[in-house]
Amino acid sequence: MKTAMLIAVLGFCAALCFVESSHEEEREAAVYLTDLVSKAESAIKRGIPCRCDKNSDELNGEQSYMNGNCGDGWKKCRSVNAIFNCCQRV
């Protein structure tokens, strides 16, 4: 949850920087920050490897960032925290 909140705050800051920038160099920095935020968001949504079994070191699932829904073709194997689930392909 901390990661998602941080990304949301960074996204807001990037948008604010872009709107408030008066120099080309500031605009370039805002565009760069916006690009980093979008890449971070897609990395979270795409899935980070996770363990379905707490007692195993095998990364046999992917984290899902869809409020408890793993999506079509996936099944939930473990809750990681309040936002993320560890999901496996069916």
Swiss-Prot record:
Main location (coarse class): secreted
InterPro entries associated with the record: Myo_ane_neurotoxin_sf (IPR023355)
Protein localization: Secreted; Nematocyst
Cysteines engaged in disulfide bonds, as pairs: 50-86, 52-77, 70-87
Signal sequence, start to end: 1-21
Keywords, comma-separated and alphabetical: Cleavage on pair of basic residues, Disulfide bond, Ion channel impairing toxin, Myotoxin, Nematocyst, Neurotoxin, Potassium channel impairing toxin, Secreted, Signal, Toxin, Voltage-gated potassium channel impairing toxin, Voltage-gated sodium channel impairing toxin
A single GO molecular function term of this UniProt record: sodium channel regulator activity
An example Gene Ontology CC term for this record: extracellular region
Removed propeptide positions: 22-44
Superkingdom to which the source organism belongs: Eukaryota
Further facts: Negative results: has no hemolytic activity on human erythrocytes. Has no effect on the shape, color and configuration of cardiomyocytes. Does not show significant effect on the calcium currents.
Function of the protein: Cardioactive peptide that acts on voltage-gated sodium channels (hNav1.5/SCN5A) and voltage-gated potassium channels (Kv). The activity on sodium channels consists of inhibition on sodium current inactivation with no significant effect on current activation. This effect may be caused by direct interaction of the toxin with sodium channel site-3. The activity on potassium channels consists of a significant increase of the amplitude of the transient component of the potassium current, shifting the current threshold to more negative membrane potentials.
UniProt family annotation: Belongs to the sea anemone sodium channel inhibitory toxin family.
Record protein name field: Delta-aiptatoxin-Adi1a
Classification of source organism: Eukaryota, Metazoa, Cnidaria, Anthozoa, Hexacorallia
